[in-house]
Amino acid sequence: MIDFLKLPSPCYVLDETLLDRNLAVIDRVRRESGAEIIVALKACAMWSIFPELARHSDGATASSAAEARLVFEEYGKPAHTYAPVYTDRNIDEILRCSDHITFNSVAQFERFGPMALLRGISCGLRINPQYSPVETDLYNPCVPGSRLGVTADELNDLPAGIDGLHFHVLCESRPHHLKLALEAVEKHFGQYLDRIGWLNMGGGHLM
């Protein structure tokens, strides 16, 4: 039992019992579904436990150059990077620290994708399946006019060099929300699914 009165303040306290319980859930989902689980740092960026997280996952995501560097240097694996914006100032660091990069649009891929492909990085495209259970428009990536992913009518064909598709429409969501999201993806993007090597279904899964 932790005596919280004896802890220095401020400090971060990690309950290893609860962590082990969560990791057991992740292990079961990986085993029974066959899916790879990629940890989002915004859920837990305590780098001192990265070795333990790495043993129970298939990598970690990054949404910025700084996060990509943290994954690369402390998680011990290149990052699966998806960022809202890529710029000439941050792209070199992102390329150095990533082995998967997802782009928001075809134009963004056309600008930075060739640089990633030259380094052997697997490139993906974020899609907008026009479904999300998120009720607050500010946080809903599928609202009309969203720049977070391409809709089916904006994608005439899968660009050469795109290995995967990525949708991120959930937030602390349950399995039935993922089912509905997958149905929307199949409806709007099903013709591309047999042409890709991976499908990133995160994040936002409450596990």
Locate each region found by the language model.
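A short, N-terminal amphipathic alpha-helix
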Residues: 22-32
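Active-site anion-handling motifs in enzyme catalytic cores
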Residues: 18-20, 67
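Active-site-proximal beta-alpha core segment in soluble small-molecule metabolic enzymes
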Residues: 35-198
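Active-site anion/phosphate-binding pocket segments in diverse small-molecule metabolic enzymes
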Residues: 10-13, 105-110, 203-207
